[in-house]
A protein has these predicted regions:
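Non-catalytic C-terminal accessory region of glycerolipid acyltransferases
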Residues: 468, 514, 648, 723-829
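Conserved AMP-binding/adenylate-forming
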Residues: 281-406, 412-415, 429, 440
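Conserved AMP-binding/adenylate-forming core of the ANL superfamily
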Residues: 20-65, 69-73, 90-95, 168
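AMP-binding/adenylate-forming catalytic core of the ANL superfamily
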Residues: 106, 359, 368, 373-374, ...
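AMP-binding/adenylate-forming catalytic domain of the ANL superfamily
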Residues: 441, 451, 476-504, 520-525, ...
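Conserved AMP-binding/adenylation subdomain of ANL enzymes
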Residues: 172-190, 197-287
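Conserved ATP-dependent adenylate/AMP-binding module captured primarily in the ANL superfamily
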Residues: 72, 87-116, 132-134, 174-192, ...
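Conserved pre-ATP/AMP-binding loop-to-beta segment of ANL
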Residues: 16-18, 135-153, 160, 184-190
């Protein structure tokens, strides 16, 4: 293999096999290898139309998604240079990279508030629709092995980031090395991707390697624990590439789940017993835990930061394989790795085939075909990165153990040298400190003091109120005298600042501490609160207008749409589950901060049942309609249908939207549908009617019984109008993924005069998140048969009219509401 174009061409061999599965949190979208190849070729043609030529730089700045993948391969197919940017990077960094790389085009995302405007660009969210009309063209000649394929900018500490030049040869070499190291991987496996694709570790191990072998990659929209665990349990995942911080998050999620059931002690006893058992018995012992990860999950691939012995032991004891590797972006990036059949705890494994490693004064130095040629237009940095005899200086400190495996001691730049000349490796102290009760997060840095450096701990407490001095004293009890922590600071935010791969930005922490005159045991308050910035960004408000006591609705103008955006943004930023039902008119900004800090469990939604859409219960509906519903309806309603021919071309689920005048709207509309659609359609009903504000016990019994009947015999599910909307939205997404259409009444209540009422904003959220066509429906005559307020129906004629399907998912929220209202009103006139 000489370049990534060979991987792209291999997509043709895998045809309809799933290449990418994207879980938006609402829907599940699949892209086959054949579809991905066509998207890439069309993207190349589109880039040609935009004036992008061979060797031109294209900035790729967005979250992991099918569109990101299509854009990447389109740039490769065009012969351009991919310039990936961390999705969470700020606008200034993106501008700096665009300027330094001389990018001529950008692919960016609407998920960010700020966008690049200095160069032509396209939004990732628009790519699918935009490429539909693009005619594929013959691809340009294949690139030479030494042509630049990617320009990857390092995260850096201070100053301008450096552009790492990676050629087609570099990437192809490392891809061959990685796949050769793990012959167990095959096209039958699915991989869960949790790290940003702009990070080379994820790109090589979790993106290029699986696609080159015909595997399936699963992306999730947010990294909250529930989304990750749902992907594990529903997607038949075999392996996941992760950094240690993500493994810690998953470990905490497992421990909390056991503790919530009163089984925390049992889990600890199982973990203690497991090391003495053979692998098969370990797997049997931890069957309850393994079920949470799916029946085929087997492998954690860890990299990007040192893996603690505690994390390795936890997952290994549970019967999972944990393979740790090591590398740098400059090396494409993988240099060493443990093997699936053999792991050495605390070591990062053995050099990949073709990788040479040596230690010079403790520094790890490497060379091989995967090592980059230099930094982009930075000759001084390039010369400083290589020795006179051509070895790349990694800047990492290491040693080789008795098995020949490499052990990484830490970054040379992070090494703390005390005034006594003692070398202190902060990673070793962090591992001890993180185990102490009262610590949520921590890092250890060197602070200038007495002609050397003080070993200084920065601690995020867990909310238990335990004094920091007590925490540090306990940690020091497990550390030898020469390396003990001699200073500490309380970090007042919920998390330490991190990169998108969850590494702590120690340089940022140190800069903040150096700015404080009272560094030692002071409380550190960040100059710009991350949570306040997030709220202000979502709501489009200046920072000084968002205060802890501000009411989100009354003071800040939080709408139903903005509430969903805010909850999603919080979950993405803080990697937690947040119940949108907990955010109401009386919720203050400080209340939400408390929810984040407490990481409260989200209550299970009420009445959302997927099993009522199964074949069995669709049969129940057929039976109920045949012997009860249709005969009863025909006693009062003479039903006729217009426009049914407009439904003939429907090839999948849709959203039927209708005016609402009577309790009989739903059966009249469903009986107007052909049977193939009728029993694959679920109806949204006002949740508050069934579950809220009972006047007495009899009304409670009646309403709850009515819901049970409607759910089982009519295919109804609850849709709240106040709070808790997102749970119902997720339910609608799952129904759509199972091929079920939806019937909703966007007015939200029955019209008492018969005139169409304004549609609620929730419809726009449904259309955009579900990405389904909208079929307008008008029902005339029921306001005379059973109007609002009537207790008994009269006889009358009813007409149901269907309009042309509308594709509105890529229009604005306001346009969706306007177009939908006009379509239904047009059928009523």
């Amino acid at each position: 293999m000489t370049g990534l174009h060979e991987v792209l061409e291999s997509f043709r061999n895998h045809g309809g096999r799933a290449a990418i599965i994207y879980r938006s949190g609402i829907r599940r979208f699949t892209c086959s290898y054949a579809e991905l190849y066509i998207l890439a070729v069309k993207m190349a043609a589109y880039l040609e139309q935009q004036g992008v030529g061979r060797g031109d730089k294209v900035l790729l700045w967005g979250p992991n998604s099918t569109a990101w993948v299509a854009a990447f391969w389109g740039i490769v197919a065009r012969g351009g240079v991919v310039v990936p940017v961390d999705f969470l990077s700020g606008l200034d960094r993106a501008k700096g990279i665009a300027l330094h790389s001389r990018a001529t085009f950008a692919v960016q995302s609407r998920a960010r508030v700020e966008h690049l405007e200095e160069i032509p660009s396209v939004m990732l969210e628009d790519l699918e629709a935009l490429l539909e009309s693009v005619v594929p063209r013959d691809l340009p000649p294949v690139p030479s092995p030494d042509d630049i394929c990617e320009l990857v900018y390092t995260s850096g500490t201070t100053g301008a980031p450096k552009g790492v030049v990676l050629t087609h040869r570099n990437l192809a070499t490392n891809l061959h090395q990685v796949t050769g190291q793990f012959p167990e991987i095959s096209s039958e496996y699915s991989f869960l991707s949790l790290l940003p694709l702009s990070h080379m570790f994820e790109q090589m191990a979790g993106f290029l390697a699986p696609l080159s072998l015909g595997g399936t990659i699963v992306y999730v929209r947010t990294l909250k624990p529930s989304s990750i665990m749902e992907a594990f349990s529903e997607e038949d995942i075999w392996a996941v590439v992760a950094v240690p911080r993500l493994l810690q998050l998953l470990k905490s999620s497992v421990e909390q789940a056991f503790a919530a059931k009163g089984l925390g002690g049992l889990l600890q006893r199982m973990l203690s017993l497991s090391p003495s058992l053979p692998p098969l018995l370990r797997r049997i012992l931890f069957t309850p835990l393994r079920r949470r990860f799916g029946r085929n999950f087997n492998l954690f691939v860890s990299g990007g930061a040192p893996l603690s012995a505690e994390l390795f032991r936890f997952w290994n004891a549970a019967g999972f394989t944990v393979v740790e590797g090591y590398g740098l972006s400059e090396c494409s990036p993988v240099l060493t790795a443990n093997m699936i059949e053999r792991q050495v705890p605390g070591a990062v494994g053995w050099p990949l085939p073709g990788v040479e490693i040596r230690l010079v004064n403790g520094e790890i130095q490497v060379r091989g075909g995967n090592v980059f040629p230099g930094y982009y237009e930075n000759e001084a940095a390039t010369q400083g990165a290589f020795t006179a005899d051509g070895w790349f200086r990694t800047g990492d400190l290491g040693a080789v153990d008795s098995s020949g495996a490499l052990v990484v001691r830490g970054r040379a730049k992070d090494l703390i040298v005390t005034a006594a000349g003692i070398n202190v490796y902060p990673e070793e102290l962090e591992e001890v400190l993180a185990k102490v009760a009262g610590v949520r997060e921590c890092c250890v840095i060197g602070m200038p003091r007495g002609g050397g450096e003080e070993v200084h701990a920065v601690i995020v407490p867990d909310g238990s109120g335990r004094p920091l001095g007590e925490i540090v004293n306990e940690a020091n009890g497990a550390i030898d005298d020469l390396h003990r922590i001699t200073g500490y600071t309380l970090w007042s935010e919920q998390e330490l600042p991190k990169t998108t791969t969850l590494k702590v930005k120690k340089f940022a922490v140190k800069e903040h501490l150096l700015e404080k005159a009272d560094v030692g045991s002071a409380v550190l308050t960040a100059t710009a609160d991350r949570f306040i910035r997030l709220v202000a960004g979502v709501l489009g408000l200046p920072l000084d207008e968002v205060g802890e006591e501000s009411f989100l609705v009354a003071d800040l103008g939080l709408t139903s749409i903005a509430r969903l955006e805010l909850v999603t943004a919080i979950e993405q930023e803080f990697r937690i589950d947040l119940d949108d039902a907990a955010i109401g008119p009386q919720t203050r900004v400080g209340d939400v901060r408390g929810m984040i800090s407490r990481r409260e469990r989200v209550p299970a939604p009420r009445g959302l049942r997927l099993w009522t859409s199964t074949l069995l219960f669709r049969g129940v509906r057929v039976l109920a309609d045949t012997i009860l519903h249709r005969p009863l309806l025909s006693l009062f309603v003479s039903l006729s249908t217009e426009g049914a021919e407009r439904l003939a071309g429907l090839s999948g689920p849709v959203i039927f939207i209708a005016n609402h005048t009577s309790y009989l709207d739903q059966p009249c509309i469903l009986f107007s549908l052909p049977a193939s659609l009728r029993y694959r359609c679920a109806t949204a009903a006002w949740a508050e009617f069934f579950f809220v504000n009972f006047k007495n016990i009899l009304q409670r019994i009646w309403k709850l019984s009515a819901f049970e009947y409607c759910s089982l015999a009519l295919g109804v599910f609850p849709l709240p109008q106040s709070t808790g909307f997102r749970a119902s939205l997720c339910h609608m997404g799952r129904l759509a993924d199972r091929g079920m259409s939806l019937l909703v009444f966007p007015e939200g209540a029955r019209s008492r005069e018969g005139a169409l009422q304004p549609f609620q904003q929730g419809l726009a959220i449904m259309v955009k998140e579900l990405s389904l066509p909208v079929v307008p429906v008008a029902i005339n005559g029921l306001d005379k048969v059973l109007p609002a307020g009537a207790l008994w129906p009269k006889q009358g004629r009813v007409v149901v009219r269907f309009g042309e399907p509308l594709n509105l998912s890529r229009t604005s929220s306001a346009e969706i509401i306007t177009s939908a209202e006009q379509a239904v009103q047009g059928l009523l006139d």
